[in-house]
């Protein structure tokens, strides 16, 4: 018989689902009813910081600041010698080469530049380096290209290391080349390249650049007929497309078109949360075709006839995220836009009732999601819990929480909204703490937006903090009626005004 301390433990499944556990042995009632693997595990008490750790960390930060000042000093000395003709070469010299994933990169040569001999070599070396970084860091959570096919397309380029400042200059030039070449191309590779750039801008918090590229991807998707591939709409490809850009001659090409379409729709749905000026997204029909399983997509050769395609709604982590963003979040978008269109006051009894029903619907989906993740863990490989639902709950309800003093509140605060937003923030914080440092370094930039939304809510409702009217931050930061993307330009302006020259240059 287990000791008294262990008899009080809830099983892992009930902990993850946030439900009461009857602590039955060897299986609790929930696990026995649903056929889950019931496991009891003692909670691990994380040790605190070791003695002297904070002082060591402060010393490392000081050393890093000194090194940064040295780098910025060398940068300021070398900036005048940067050839001004290199940027002009992009506009005056025709590019050669072909469009290659994941970046549409062509060499730019100029006989007038004093570095004409080294620039193509550096550009090519940086191109292959960026491609390898993509395959190692981005491909696992942004699976829009077949991994094996992309690996075969990337050659190993052995070249000496490029200085960081030179690499930054070339990287910016490559971004411009991708956008310029995309303006004159209508192909799946163009969509993949723009998606790559858009997620980079997303991670940097450059929402204007992201939304512009997302609009281009949306239009290209329509012109290439990608909604037809996904079974969402009978949109015919544009007659401006060449025939080879439309036809899918292989299963890999067909799957890449499918994944590109769903990635566009998924990012569009996440970004549009809480933005009144953004057009509402439409829910995907039940008969839509979703991406294949992770096992099939990771095969080392072309898909065979025996590989099952698009069997289940929860066949992969990508499919589950698509289901959340395009099906479950669609009612949230429609609800927010209906309030704007009708001019109804948010916070009334009818509004609260409708918002609570949406919250309950998301909670039910989360329970199904947890069960699906357990099935995927047993069948294929583990998947990280999706964080996109957290900003959906926060965005839906944060405007009705207790706003800080100094921020005008049109309606009385709703206790239910306070409780649910705080629970969503705590749940997300618990998931982030369980992630390893290596996972955080290569996680999706889409995770940055939920983290910032939760951190902003924590700061706004904190009891012990600087009053909002006395804070150096813009008052809109504490006004939770604004979405995160709506205040980013104000925060960037605040950073430019108040940050030190060192931080502004980083």
Curated annotation (Swiss-Prot):
Segments of skewed composition (Polar residues): 75-84
Uses described in the biotechnology field: Notoamides have been shown to exhibit antitumoral activities. Notoamides A-C show moderate cytotoxicity against HeLa and L1210 cells with IC(50) values in the range of 22-52 mg/ml, but the IC(50) value of notoamide D is greater than 100 mg/ml. Moreover, notoamide C induces G2/M-cell cycle arrest at a concentration of 6.3 mg/ml.
Segments of this protein annotated with the region Disordered: 73-102
Origin superkingdom: Eukaryota
Chief site of localization: nucleus
GO cellular component, one term: nucleus
Matches recorded under SMART domains: GAL4 (SM00066)
GO molecular-function terms, A-Z: DNA binding; DNA-binding transcription factor activity, RNA polymerase II-specific; zinc ion binding
Protein name as annotated: Notoamide biosynthesis cluster transcriptional coactivator notQ'
């Amino acid at each position: 018989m287990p000791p008294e301390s262990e008899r009080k433990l809830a099983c892992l499944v009930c902990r993850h689902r946030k439900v009461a556990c009857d602590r039955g042995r060897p299986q609790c009632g929930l696990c026995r009813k649903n056929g889950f693997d019931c496991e009891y595990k003692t909670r691990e008490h994380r040790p605190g910081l070791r003695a002297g750790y904070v002082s060591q960390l402060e010393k490392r930060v000081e050393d890093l600041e000194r090194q940064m000042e040295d780098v910025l000093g060398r940068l300021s000395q070398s900036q005048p010698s940067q050839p001004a003709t290199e940027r002009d070469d992009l506009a005056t010299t025709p590019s050669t080469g072909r469009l290659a994933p994941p970046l549409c990169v062509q060499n730019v040569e100029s006989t007038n530049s004093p570095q004409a001999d080294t620039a193509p070599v550096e550009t090519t070396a940086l191109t292959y380096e960026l491609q390898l970084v993509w395959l190692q860091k981005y491909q696992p959570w942004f699976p829009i290209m077949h991994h094996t096919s992309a690996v075969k397309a990337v050659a190993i380029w052995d070249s000496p290391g490029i200085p960081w400042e030179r690499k930054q200059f070339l990287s910016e030039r490559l971004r411009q080349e991708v956008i310029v070449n995309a303006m004159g191309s209508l192909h799946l590779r163009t969509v993949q390249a723009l998606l790559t750039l858009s997620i980079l801008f997303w991670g940097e918090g450059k929402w204007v650049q992201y939304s512009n590229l997302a609009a281009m991807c949306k239009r290209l998707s329509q012109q290439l007929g990608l909604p037809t591939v996904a079974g969402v709409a009978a949109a015919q490809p544009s007659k401006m497309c060449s025939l080879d850009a439309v036809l899918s001659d292989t299963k890999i090409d067909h799957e890449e078109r499918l994944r590109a379409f769903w990635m566009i729709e998924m990012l569009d749905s996440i970004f549009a949360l809480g933005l009144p000026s953004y057009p509402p997204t439409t829910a995907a029909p039940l008969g839509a075709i979703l991406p294949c399983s992770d096992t099939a997509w990771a095969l080392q050769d072309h898909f065979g006839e025996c590989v099952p395609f698009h069997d289940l709604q929860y066949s992969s982590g990508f499919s589950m995220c698509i289901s959340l963003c395009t099906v479950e979040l669609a009612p949230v978008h429609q609800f927010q836009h209906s309030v704007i269109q009708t001019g109804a006051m948010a916070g009334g009894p009818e509004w609260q009732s409708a918002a609570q029903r949406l919250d309950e619907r998301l909670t039910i989906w989360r329970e199904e999601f947890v069960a699906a993740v357990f099935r995927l863990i047993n069948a294929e490989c583990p998947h990280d819990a999706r964080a996109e639902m957290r900003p959906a709950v926060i965005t839906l309800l944060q405007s009705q929480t207790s706003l800080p003093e100094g921020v005008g509140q049109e309606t009385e605060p709703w206790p239910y909204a306070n409780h649910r937003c705080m629970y969503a923030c705590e749940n997300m914080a618990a998931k982030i703490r369980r992630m390893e440092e290596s996972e955080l370094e290569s996680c999706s930039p889409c995770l940055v937006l939920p983290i910032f939304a939760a951190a902003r809510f924590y700061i706004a409702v904190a009891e012990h903090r600087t009053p909002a009217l006395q804070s150096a931050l813009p008052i809109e930061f504490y006004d939770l009626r604004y979405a995160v993307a709506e205040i980013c330009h104000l925060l960037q302006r605040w950073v430019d005004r108040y940050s030190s020259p060192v931080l502004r240059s980083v």
